[in-house]
Amino acid sequence: MTNFENKEVWFITGSQHLYGEETLRQVANNSKEIVEGLNGSDNVPVKLIHQDTVKSSDEITKVMLDANNSSSCIGVILWMHTFSPAKMWIKGLSIIKKPICHFHTQFNAEIPWSKIDMDFMNLNQSAHGDREFGFIMSRMRKKRKVIVGHWKTEVTQKKVGNWQRVALGWDELQHIKVARIGDNMRQVAVTEGDKVAAQIKFGVEVNAYDSSDVTQHIDKVSDDEVNSLLKKYEKDYDLTDALKDGGDQRQSLVDAAKIELGLRAFLEEGGFMAFTDTFENLGALKQLPGLAVQRLMADGYGFGAEGDWKTAALLRAMKVMAQGMEGGTSFMEDYTNHFTEGKDYVLGSHMLEICPSIADSKPTCEVHPLGIGGKEDPVRLVFNSPKGKALNASLVDMGTRFRLIVNEVEAVEPEADLPNLPVARVLWDPKPDMDTAVTAWILAGGAHHTVYTQALSTEFLEDFADIAGIELLVIDDNTSVRQFKDTLNANEAYYHLFQHGM
């Protein structure tokens, strides 16, 4: 999906010349040991690179410029081992473009009660050094992640690792190219948006292509390639009898394989890591891509149906963040509701395109009619999803800013089998309850398309929104409609002032 080994996070320790060479040598040695310890943790996926201790404005400015200019550096972790007067940091913090993590830790975990003296106190000053540093970043209105805890503890290492994952997702957005195959579904509002503003804000490059750009790759697919992929389908999925070799709809699976091979070749040739399509612009494609899209998502590609490029880009970023973690991440749509006397639920699904990374068992591979698009019956993977904590995330363009909306949910098992539903699905209980959650979602302008994930928590997206400088609205167990409406109104003023530097 993405190679963690090609990326790095710089660990920068602040001090000053006041303390003398011996203290500064100890600061450097301690910093190196912290970096080595974090690099040895399985919870820290991106290699930390120790930088020389910075002790002056010039040194700080230089390392920040170097970080900006490094294509490998995806972020900086800043820690004040001793006191480091914060006015020295103003120029450097003014120019740094990479995500910032302010790490409030200490080399020693405990106070050595019987041995502590002023030498110890002068060396280990992060308790007030980091407060001085925190002030200047708040004074400069710098968005950053603050992590508090001893560097040897697992909980702290996980926090560092999770922030690194968010920085990886952000770095991915700086380089991502999204291919829109066809246009938006006609007359749909929420999938529209300002692609120029998105490129300025996120770095995402979005361009449109015709379905013929894909079909010309399909025409080049060889029989050997198709046969090899068919064998993989037979191994990875439970094929219905109609799709098995000799089945009366085997050709549909052959056509689906050609679509996958051609679409994959198109994406690889163009360097696209996310894409959209729409059933209204299929051209010479024999089927609306279903199986192909599902398998590409499973390989890490971002996808949005009906031209939804914002969800496609967000899905790719979240898949990069979640790489190697337990739980899947998929394109999703709030499809239909289940209102009962007791609990209310939402059934999430789509016409075809749900990622098998969220499957609870080996998917079945089936072919069924599709009443829209005017093409042949498409092949798709069908499955249920596991129960457990999850969230839905929606990125929308509000005209003056981008807004990220997150609803925490609890996936549950369907109350009965769904023998006549020929699509992948997941049933969830929105937090804090159906009434409050959906009311808040609608008030926020949340889309019907989302990214659904069981791998990432809300904290990942909170950190992402801070890095991007975009609005975040969270709907969870603590949400009330009255409070949520107040937040919406307050945010209108805040983001107007924030965007205009007031």
Swiss-Prot record:
CDD domains: L-arabinose_isomerase. The keyword Repeat does not apply. GO terms for cellular component: cytosol. GO terms for biological process: L-arabinose catabolic process to xylulose 5-phosphate. Pathway: Carbohydrate degradation; L-arabinose degradation via L-ribulose; D-xylulose 5-phosphate from L-arabinose (bacterial route): step 1/3. SUPFAM superfamilies: FucI/AraA C-terminal domain-like, FucI/AraA N-terminal and middle domains. Disulfide bonds: none annotated. It holds the Pfam family AraA_N. Gene3D superfamilies: 3.40.50.10940. It is an enzyme of class 5 (isomerase). Its EC number is 5.3.1.4. Mn(2+) binds at residues 306, 333, 350, 449. Keywords: Arabinose catabolism, Carbohydrate metabolism, Isomerase, Manganese, Metal-binding. The keyword Manganese applies. This is L-arabinose isomerase. It comes from Christiangramia forsetii (strain DSM 17595 / CGMCC 1.15422 / KT0803) (Gramella forsetii).
